[in-house]
Amino acid sequence: MLGNKFVAQLALQHLRNRGLVNSPSRLTFVRNRFAWGSDAVGPNVPVGGKMGASENPELHTYDGDYRGTISKGDKPIPDYFYRTPTTGRTYIDRCVTYFISAVIWAWFSYHMYYHSGHLLGHWYMPYLSEFTDEELGIPKDSAEDPEYWGNHKKEYGTYR
């Protein structure tokens, strides 16, 4: 494997060959001269609705050309922007959002119904037939009737 010193010297030599570093004795991260015109050539980056630089047919493809689905109510996205505005959500964004939210809600509903212990913790959940009358607040059959069972003999609205 190459040593760090060798890699630094190789990088310095490469920068000297391109004319980005004038000083032969030290390597700095600040450019010593400005690049103008054809000297200021950078990497080919996506611009506008198309991908890659227009002079390079390998990078300038129409694979990434999407301007919205106008038939579904989207505003058309222009080719180029001076400053990129917020164009709103496109049809694809809405479809993907609805699909992901439907999957999440389906998963949550299924697990809350069938496997609620995974989400809320595990504990014993008795059947309703396992509860006693005392736990449910039902008096014994041999117990006296309560004194007050309702307002059968009073007019409606006078007993509140």
Swiss-Prot record:
GO terms for cellular component: mitochondrial inner membrane; mitochondrion; respiratory chain complex I. This is Probable NADH dehydrogenase [ubiquinone] 1 beta subcomplex subunit 2, mitochondrial. Complex I is composed of 45 different subunits. InterPro entries: NDUFB2_animal. It is found in: Mitochondrion inner membrane. It is a peripheral membrane protein. GO terms for biological process: mitochondrial respiratory chain complex I assembly. Accessory subunit of the mitochondrial membrane respiratory chain NADH dehydrogenase (Complex I), that is believed not to be involved in catalysis. Complex I functions in the transfer of electrons from NADH to the respiratory chain. The immediate electron acceptor for the enzyme is believed to be ubiquinone. It comes from Caenorhabditis elegans. Belongs to the complex I NDUFB2 subunit family. Keywords: Electron transport, Membrane, Mitochondrion, Mitochondrion inner membrane, Respiratory chain, Transit peptide, Transport.
